[in-house]
């Protein structure tokens, strides 16, 4: 993925350039105001575009480093877009009511989150033996905690950056973030105070289409950062595996059969067996007897030798 892209036309079509009535403005927003039409301030989108891009880059960096991003928007128009965008990018949100001390008193809030998990366990299958009245009370308590803490119950600590819609309504959340040095990305309408906002984005904070566009861009930046973080920390498992040691390779190699290991010896044994078989199968050859003439000559010589012995004596 790449950093989400947007254009001036998208912002104009979403109505991001419309501010509040001229008599409801905050003079500190004067540098972001282009002019007024029909007593309505017009926001200078030529400044909003680079500021929005800068905010998206920061959100992407935080997500790539494994940081937590908290979406905050408790006004009616922002509630659903904030929750939907946060869930889509696996981040956290507060869209019902900001509880004082959510960030600065996180230990106490963690206790409330533990109670919420306990109630979820009770209602999920441990409700046996409880009366209907008791179950009704537990359900109401769970629903109340879910509205305020359901979006941050898995956060596990304070966020690394916070995205806020309507700084006037979320003034307490911004104050807590400033105390903890948490960067704040905020949509600033013409009636807002830009002081203390780390990454201001001048724009309409009431139009539904504009709010949806802001939330989608922030969520896309988070997703891009998560993808970049995985790519940077990913390990090529195939390249990391060391080659097999020679001794281990020999142990793992199956031994060949005798005929394959010693073909010459096997061939000699087979030849000997075949020769023995042929010899056993062949008929026995008759004994060789001396010729009659040779036998007679040998007998005559023996008689003459015996006859000459007395004469010599």
From Swiss-Prot:
InterPro entries documented for this protein: Ribosomal_uS2, Ribosomal_uS2_bac/mit/plastid, Ribosomal_uS2_CS, Ribosomal_uS2_flav_dom_sf
Pfam families (UniProt xref): Ribosomal_S2
Similarity comment: Belongs to the universal ribosomal protein uS2 family.
Organism of this sequence: Caulobacter sp. (strain K31)
Protein name: Small ribosomal subunit protein uS2
PROSITE patterns with a match to the protein in the record: RIBOSOMAL_S2_1, RIBOSOMAL_S2_2
Keywords: Ribonucleoprotein, Ribosomal protein
Annotated spans, Disordered: 281-301
């Amino acid at each position: 993925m790449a950093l989400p892209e947007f254009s001036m036309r998208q912002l104009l079509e979403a109505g991001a350039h419309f501010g509040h009535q001229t008599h409801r403005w905050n003079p500190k927003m004067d540098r972001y105001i282009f002019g007024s039409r029909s007593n309505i301030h017009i926001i200078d989108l030529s400044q909003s575009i680079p500021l929005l891009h800068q905010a998206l880059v920061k959100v992407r960096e935080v997500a790539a480093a494994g940081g937590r991003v908290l979406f905050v928007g408790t006004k009616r128009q922002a509630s659903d877009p904030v929750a939907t965008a946060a869930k889509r990018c696996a981040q956290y949100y507060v869209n019902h009511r900001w509880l004082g001390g959510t960030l600065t008193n996180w230990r106490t809030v963690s206790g409330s989150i533990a109670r919420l998990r306990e109630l979820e366990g009770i209602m999920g299958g441990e409700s046996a033996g409880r009366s209907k009245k008791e179950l009704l009370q537990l359900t109401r308590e769970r629903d109340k905690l879910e509205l305020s803490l359901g979006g941050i119950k898995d956060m596990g600590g304070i966020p690394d950056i916070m995205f806020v819609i309507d700084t006037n309504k979320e003034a307490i959340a911004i104050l807590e973030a400033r105390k903890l040095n948490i960067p704040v990305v905020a949509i600033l309408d013409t009636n807002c105070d830009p002081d203390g906002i780390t990454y201001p984005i001048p724009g309409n904070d009431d139009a539904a289409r504009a709010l949806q566009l802001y939330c989608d861009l922030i969520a896309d930046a988070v997703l891009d950062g998560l993808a970049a973080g995985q790519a940077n920390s990913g390990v090529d498992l195939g390249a990391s595996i060391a080659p097999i040691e020679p001794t281990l390779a020999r142990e793992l190699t199956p031994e060949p059969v005798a005929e394959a290991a010693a073909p010459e010896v096997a061939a000699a044994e087979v030849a000997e067996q075949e020769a023995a078989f042929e010899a056993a199968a062949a008929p026995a050859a008759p004994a060789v007897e001396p010729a009659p003439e040779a036998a007679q000559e040998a007998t005559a010589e023996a008689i003459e030798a015996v006859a000459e012995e007395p004469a010599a004596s």
